[in-house]
Every structure is written in C-alpha cells, then in structure tokens.
Curated annotation (Swiss-Prot):
Function: Required for the insertion and/or proper folding and/or complex formation of integral membrane proteins into the membrane. Involved in integration of membrane proteins that insert both dependently and independently of the Sec translocase complex, as well as at least some lipoproteins. Aids folding of multispanning membrane proteins.
Nuclease listed as a keyword: no
Protein name stated in the entry: Membrane protein insertase YidC
Family matches, as HAMAP family: YidC_type1 (MF_01810)
UniProt keyword annotations, A-Z: Cell inner membrane, Cell membrane, Chaperone, Membrane, Protein transport, Transmembrane, Transmembrane helix, Transport
Matches recorded under NCBIfam families: PRK01318.1-1, PRK01318.1-3, PRK01318.1-4, yidC_nterm, yidC_oxa1_cterm
Length: 548
C-alpha cells in the first residue's frame, strides 16, 4: 500500500459518500405536488381536528425589537411574518432575512390560541377571535429591556380572553401568555394550542440551491419529548397523511431549515398532544394541544407557551428548552461535529475570525493525528521494502493466487507489517472531514462569516474557485513527493488525474471546508518531510529511489 493507492481509497470513500448522501431522502425531501382539496385525516385530538381556520381578515400590527420584526394578525393573534434584522437576506444586502411569510406564493406562520369546548378558537364557537389592541405598532424603546403586546377579546357571554406577547431585548424567544376571566355562571373548559404551518414547495425566491451539486441540510418538522430527545418528521411523510399523534409531558414541536428554526414550547404541568396534519393545498403543520383546564365562574385562568423564531444559536436555544439546541442538525456525525464546533467557537473567541479559527483547528486536529500519520507512513515504507520479495514470490508461484495470498500473509506476519496500516489513518480522517462539512453547513455563526481577501462567506463556495485550485495544487505536490511502487500504466493515469477530479468536486464545497483541506495538505507536506527524514535514518526510505 502506497500513498497514491491511499489517494484512490479517499476518492472511493468520497464517491461512496456522495452516493449515500443522494440516497438519504430526509436530507432533501422531494416537494409534493400542490393539493387542491382539503385533507380531513388529521391527528386525533389535535387542534387541526378542531378545524382551526386560516386567520382571515384582521388588522396587521407591527412588533419590533432589536432582533425581531414581527407582523401579527389581530384575527387569532397569529404571527404571519418574521424578519431578522441581525441576519441579512444575502451577503452585502440591506434586506433582513425573512423567516415567517404570508404571501400568495408561500405560507409559513406561527399560529396559537385557545381551543377546547369553550375556547374562542374552536370553530363551533364561531370565527376566530378578533383581538383588540391599543395601537398598530409596538417598538422596543432605547433603554427598554422588555416589550409587552396585550391583545384582548370579549365573547358574547362576557368572558375576557387576553393574549400577551412578551419580547425581550436580544432574545428570539417570545413568550405568549393567556389570561382567561370567566364572567359566566358555568366553568369554562379551555385548551391552548401552538401550531406551525408551512407550504411544502418553496417558491423560486426561496429555493436557493435544491438543484445545486452541494449537499443540503434538513428542511422539515421535528419534535422532542422526555423519551425522544430529537426526532425529525419529513414534510412528505405528513403530506402522505402518516401523521404524528403522541402525548408528552414537556417537550417541543418545531419546523427547521438551514440555520433557522421556529418552535413552540408549551408550559404546563399536564400532558400535551403533539400532532402533525396535512392541511391541504400543499400546506402541512406540526403543533401541540394542551389538556383542558377548567376556569371556574368568577375566576381567572392562565396558560403560557414560548415561541422560538430565529437563528439556531445553540446555547440560547438550550436555555429556552431542553434539547432545543439539537435542531442544529449535524447529521449522523453530530458526535464529532458538536465538539469540533465548541472548539472552533472557543478559538474564535480569541482570534475573532472564523477563517483563522478553521486554520488553527486544522493544526490541532492534524497535530493530534500525527502519531497515526507517522504510523501510516512507516507502514507504507515497510510495504515498499517488501516489494522485491513480493515480486519474487509472484514470479515463483505464477498464477497460484491462493498460495500467493497465504505466503504474503506469512511474510507480513514475519516482518510485523500490517498491510492495512496505511489505510486506517485515512479512515479516521474521513469522518472528521465530513463532520466539519456538516458543522459549516449547519452552524448559523458561520453563515456569511468572512475570512480575508475575496472570501466573504466561509459557508458558501469560493466565487472565483481559487481555493479549490490551490487545494488541487497541494494535492498534486503531495502526490509528486510521495514514493510509489505503482507500475500499471492505467493506475498511473488515474493517480495523475486524481488532483483534477478532487478539484472539480471541491468547486461547489463551502470555502471554509476547502480552506481546511488546503491547510491540512500543507501540514501533510511538512509532516511528510519530517517523517521521511526519520525513515531515512532507519533505512526505510530513500529519496533517490522515489519514482514519479
């Protein structure tokens, strides 16, 4: 086993990963066709069963803090639009990123209200409540840390329902508090609900990369319970009416996309019904409904929940609800990606640049792996030293493959050489490489993070393809500096074109990942020379015997 064969192993592993990724449906679920009829099969006992209608006509009010710009419909009190001023829509754009949207092309809303027998959002009791508000615009003032938006509704029986949105400075968690005053003579049976609904198919202005060669993160629904910390639920599964219907004490429901999330976190001592529903017209929903509570005559009842609407900032999300930070989807290598991100974030706290942080973490990773790298090159050198004996063995035994295999194994054992010793370090490096990819694609902190010169977004591909070309050049130098025993002309041609093939692959990769690979290759060149000097002293390597 030599260096060039190891490069072939990397290529095969890389291609296998690409095939596997394309096969893994939940990373990029296919959009469902728009439905023209209302689907009636929904989760039993859910708010959707109650038939919570669209918000209908109401007044739109504006609610602004330093990090949120919300539009709330007074008909039902749903959040119909959410802008994030701290996150530009695109690089160098003055327009904020829009997370929630209500338009003819796309629906993504955070609905909530009070259902149950006497709830104002129960269709049996009439249209959804039309709340009264004191003003049309609420703004968090300078020096103010909290903004409250009270909305009141009084039904025909004189019962008063108050829905208050509470927003805090610098916070993407919005508390939604309900206050029910029973003015009648009979108990009121009330349940609260929170629901996220979204169009399955993205419109062109939001579909920024479904046809690109690059891989994509999960877009869909998710939920958490004490028994299941984090479970994803694909939109197409909901569209097929394979709906969620479970009871949970605690937990949350959410909708996810790259870098951003919305989630409802109910706050009550009882159990909640978590459900999904196909609402028809190409729209799906995930939500919760609480157990009914009784508000006695002349008494006041309270219910509370929290809406997360914003970027997937792990430490802040973890403080809002247990396991909410798991919505940062690092894929099946999360156990590597999470520690890598924590280390990267710690380094960034000192250097202040994510690109330099990636360079430093590359040195750290390669430093930790140096003993394995040294063992790899030593094993390869020993294998090269055995080539004359192996060649003589092949000439002596001819076409007797079984005898050749047996004697080769005996030779390896006698010489204390592991024929797979050169592959093992590469197998260790591949998960780290892929984990770093998921970290770059899933961490909002790296979204639009600049490095230097022409690299203004480490999570996006190099616009001028300079980094992929540099990566190919470094791979070419590694290849030329590595001894080889390959004599087959076809294998030699494959190895010659390997840097070119990798360069083409890396054209669409995040520039931060390509930067990691360039630095890793440069470290490999340095380590290679240091190891070769040591092997020369042991008689296991000779520069004069190197073949191109």
């Amino acid at each position: 086993m030599d260096s060039q064969r190891n490069l072939l192993v990397i290529a095969l592993l890389f291609v296998s990963f690409m095939i596997w990724q394309a096969w893994e449906q939940d990373k990029n679920p296919q959009p469902q066709a728009q439905q023209t009829t209302q689907t009636t099969t929904t989760a039993a006992g859910s708010a959707a069963d109650q038939g919570v209608p669209a918000s209908g006509q109401g007044k739109l009010i504006s609610v602004k803090t330093d990090v949120l710009d919300l539009t709330i419909n007074t008909r039902g009190g749903d959040v119909e639009q959410a802008l994030l001023p701290a996150y530009p829509k695109e690089l160098n754009s003055t327009q904020p990123f829009q997370l929630l949207e209500t338009s003819p092309q796309f629906i993504y809303q955070a609905q909530s209200g009070l259902t149950g027998r006497d709830g104002p959002d129960n269709p049996a009791n009439g249209p959804r409540p039309l709340y009264n508000v004191e003003k049309d615009a609420y703004v968090l003032a300078e020096g103010q840390n909290e903004l409250q938006v009270p909305m009141t509704y009084t039904d025909a029986a004189g019962n008063t329902f108050t829905k208050t949105f509470v927003l805090k400075r610098g916070d993407y968690a919005v508390n939604v508090n309900y206050n029910v005053q029973n003015a009648g003579e009979k108990p009121l049976e009330i349940s609260s609900f929170g629901q996220l609904k979204q169009s399955i198919t993205l419109p062109p202005h939001l579909d920024t990369g479904s046809s690109n060669f690059a891989l994509h993160t999960f877009r869909g629904a998710a939920y958490s319970t004490p028994d299941e910390k984090y479970e994803k639920y694909k939109f197409d599964t909901i569209a097929d009416n394979e709906n969620l219907n479970i009871s949970s004490k605690g937990g949350w429901v959410a909708m996810l996309q790259q870098y951003f999330a919305t989630a409802w976190i109910p706050h009550n001592d009882g159990t909640n019904n978590f459900y999904t529903a196909n609402l028809g017209n190409g729209i799906v929903a995930i939500g919760y409904k609480s157990q009914p509570v009784l508000v006695q005559p002349g008494q006041t009842g309270a219910m509370n929940s929290t809406l997360w609407v914003g970027p997937e900032i792990q430490d802040k999300m973890a403080a809002v609800a247990p396991h909410l930070d798991l919505t940062v989807d690092y894929g099946w290598l999360w156990f590597i990606s999470q520690p890598l991100f924590k280390l990267l974030k710690w380094i960034h706290s000192f250097v202040g640049n994510w690109g330099f942080s990636i360079i430093i973490i590359t040195f750290i990773v390669r430093g930790i792996m140096y003993p394995l790298t040294k063992a790899q090159y030593t094993s390869m050198a020993k294998m090269r030293m055995l080539q004359p004996k192996i060649q003589a063995m092949r000439e002596r035994l001819g076409d007797d493959k079984q005898r050749i295999s047996q004697e080769m194994m005996a030779l390896y054992k006698a010489e204390k050489v592991n024929p797979l010793g050169g592959c093992f370090p590469l197998l260790i490096q591949m998960p780290i490489f892929l984990a770093l990819y998921y970290m770059l694609m899933g961490s909002v902190e790296l979204r639009q993070a600049p490095f230097a010169l022409w690299i203004h977004d480490l999570s996006a591909q190099d616009p001028y393809y300079i980094l992929p070309i540099l990566m190919g050049v470094t791979m070419f130098f590694i290849q030329k500096m590595s001894p080889t025993t390959v004599t087959d002309p076809m294998q030699q041609k494959i190895m010659t074109f390997m840097p070119v093939i990798f360069t083409v692959f890396f054209l669409w990769f995040p520039s931060g990942l390509v930067l990691y690979y360039i630095v890793s290759n440069l470290v490999t060149i340095i380590q290679q020379q240091l190891i070769y000097r040591g092997l020369e002293k042991r008689g296991l390597h000779s520069r004069e015997k190197k073949k191109s």
